[in-house]
């Protein structure tokens, strides 16, 4: 994630995906720290203020829903009860709400809203004209549609009493939808990849549909004294007047203009200040050859072994999940869904991705810890082993709990929340497992922190790099905490706000900066770059990235029941996130150049190539495909379609997964620098993994997503997610095309896992030598 160009008296840095900086002056380090801290404080102040507005203006949850004829349609607490039913069944892993979730089953908000609108239109058509709504004349239909839009968009929520008053026709529509969803969840649906008996309790089904009703009501009812709904008119539904808001269009334009201007400024800066590189400090021999591993460094080997196995298991779950999308409930005809339903395999697929990537990064941090202070802290190996056991407990315990929750093995109490499935994508694990993971991260912070604090007492030129390393470590450990900030009965909009703190800030924010610092340490240990110069680059890298990344969290919340202020800030600052990614080509070139600086660096060639792949996927997966869906007007039509999957695979695996593989390889190389690697196998795995991912995206996910987008724009969001569209011959063929890329990717992954495990279980001979010196 970092490459640096240096001169003796000044330094031009290409940092974090290609951003450039000209280093001059003796007070530069101090100024960079002030810049980073200012960005950090100001950005979180804005994000926090927007959060207070989100909480204040979240869609109200009615105390009860009552028809004008006095019938109580939804009694007290039934909507929140329904949200809990939805969560325990798998929540976002079985369809989506407000566009957030999985892709095979419908978006339940859009589906309920469309079915309700159709029912009302047909009910009125039969009553007034004696015929079905589909047979009305244009004039007759226009009259009823205008009436329908008035009905659906008028906000009849009584703030003083907490009641929502609805027309009796909406109560009849509710009962009709209840019957439909009862059939879906009781009998199962192959079109939706929902297993038979997913939910057969009639009481819970009524609660579930009450929750669906509320999300649909909030998506169409205008905010008080406004002409847009609580979700900024998402999802697209022409029948009820849900069209893009003016703010969505205006802020899209602003974000695009800002992006172009920022890229232009960066090109201007680079063209004016780029200098040649001085590599005179690179040693003639590998400084790691002959170094003795500390006990804690040896103890990290089992972490990398688990990384390999979890990576493989994630691929297996992905293969099964993809087949469910085509076959409905099986794998090549084998009916697995009654034992291992889609909602479980997809949960495990997404969660295992987070687990193995995080494990790789945590292990890399633990491996580097002795490098920081130059010695092995007391009981460090014991701490590393305890943390390993805790991580295994969280992984296995959370997976078992999720299966039990979905399969109704945890009873009717609250155990589903504490030990089962919370229903929120990427943070699906039960609260107990969440808390255990947080405690494990604090232990990891302690293990690394004591090494860093000891090193900070020494007067060396790498103190800023160590302090930055400690800060990013603290960020990773502490910023998982927002995942504990919501409760079992928390408002969905509030949950979404904190959830994206974890998914975006934790994974895409602090992991990104942590990776920059870790790689800086690794290259500094090899003496390819100087530690103080690396600190300059890493500090400015973090400042620039976080200036867009922190507030850019809000781009996930455009339509989650949030006010327009979230859309405005999110669109502008998410555009700034893209700017560094445009220059990743420079990073790739510099990484390759570093690998050729001395003959001995050739043994790091394929490690460096994995870093180059990170730069490539940063541009394509995070940059191109990220900005494809980030502008408000684009996300309005694309959210929750396969275009989202394109970005998710290209960014989460492409950037963070590839970086996890690269860090694993780097540590394994550093453990045995004198060992000869089977580079043919590693080269094959590298090309197969990356080509396979490209095939998966361009042969299947992207074409499906673009066709869905066209359908969403021309017909409505509900249609783009409907089985009538997704089960057409063209879409089915495109889904099967994914098998080509998946197969190539899986073969490459198998080769990588075999290569890595072979290194770990058959260690080469090492030459005894004194303990390594700290980074100079």
Predicted regions and their residues:
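Hydrophobic cores of alpha-helical transmembrane segments in multi-pass integral membrane proteins
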Residues: 33-53, 86, 229, 246-273, ...
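Non-cytosolic membrane-interface motifs at loop->transmembrane helix junctions
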Residues: 423-431, 494-504, 562-573, 639-645
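Short, Lys/Arg-enriched N-terminal segments with co-localized hydrophobic residues
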Residues: 15-28
